[in-house]
Design a protein with these regions (language model features):
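Predominantly soluble domains enriched in secretory-pathway, periplasmic, or organellar proteins
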Residues: 1-261
Length: 261
């Protein structure tokens, strides 16, 4: 099955891949955007732009289960942000993280009770552009307007790992499933996908791709799939151009800096 949000119909469409037929249309909130699935494919959570909410969906019964409001709706919604909104599901699938609508913060949702939970560590510094969990230690990694931060599982304290040095020509597109790598995309015709080692704050991969508007990692993080100017491209993490070439480039240069202690 293929699952797709219908922005105008306010629904999640269930599509038979073999026939291309829409076999179910499940009601969501207003103007659904991002979608995240449970690993067994029985549940889905949909971010709704205009109603500023998350819809919980049962994919076995094809039913809308609950709507979780993110903030009081003021009529403006989240439609001013380009691209799909990011979400992150914890390894045990009991916690869903979503960016707050219109504020620099992260909202934590209990997927069992469908309730928001207090999350003081979720204060970001501007729009959250990517986030994810590190399965090995439960840390949360997120990128915002100032750089990359982590929230430790043991004490729920946030700390800055890497600050942006020169990010005006890049957009943050995603974090690898293991939480070790961050993918950025450069603007312009001669574009690149840039792979950053989060811990080291260093560029480790550069891949040519122009006009990228969507990016996803494979489950093992070794492949990067991008929707670019010429269609869908599959990139191999190990098959990179020389990273030093992009670091020395007068237009692009260094991306990130390790903060001073």
């Amino acid at each position: 099955m293929l699952y797709a949000t219908s922005f105008e119909a306010n629904a999640l469409s269930v599509i038979n891949v073999a026939t291309g037929e829409i076999i179910q249309s499940i009601t969501t909130g207003a103007h659904p955007d991002s979608l995240i699935l449970s690993r067994d494919g029985t549940k889905a959570w949909v971010m709704n732009r205009t109603s500023n909410s998350v819809s919980a969906i049962d994919l076995v019964a094809y039913q809308h289960v609950a709507d979780i409001p993110l903030e009081k709706y003021d009529g403006t919604g989240m439609s001013g942000k380009p691209g799909a909104w990011v979400m992150a599901l914890s390894p045990d699938e009991k916690t869903l993280l979503v960016p707050g609508a219109g504020r620099g913060n992260i909202v934590r949702i209990n997927t069992i009770t469908h309730q928001k939970e207090d999350f003081p560590a979720g204060d970001a510094r501007g729009v959250v552009s990517a986030m994810g969990f590190r399965p090995k230690n439960g840390e949360i990694i997120f990128a915002d307007s100032q750089g990359i931060s982590r929230i430790r599982a043991e004490d729920q304290q946030a700390s800055i790992m890497t600050q942006w040095c020169s990010r005006s020509v890049y957009s943050v597109e995603g974090i690898s499933p293991d939480g070790q790598y961050l993918a950025l995309v450069s603007y312009g015709l001669q574009g690149y996908v840039i792979l950053l080692n989060i811990n080291a704050g260093q560029i480790i991969g550069v891949y040519p791709a122009s006009y990228v508007n969507h990016l996803r990692f494979s489950a093992d993080g070794r492949k990067i799939f991008v929707m670019a100017k010429n269609g869908l491209i599959q990139l191999d993490r190990e098959s990179s151009l020389d990273p030093q070439a992009i670091i020395r480039h007068p237009q692009y240069g260094d991306v990130a800096c390790i903060p001073e202690p």
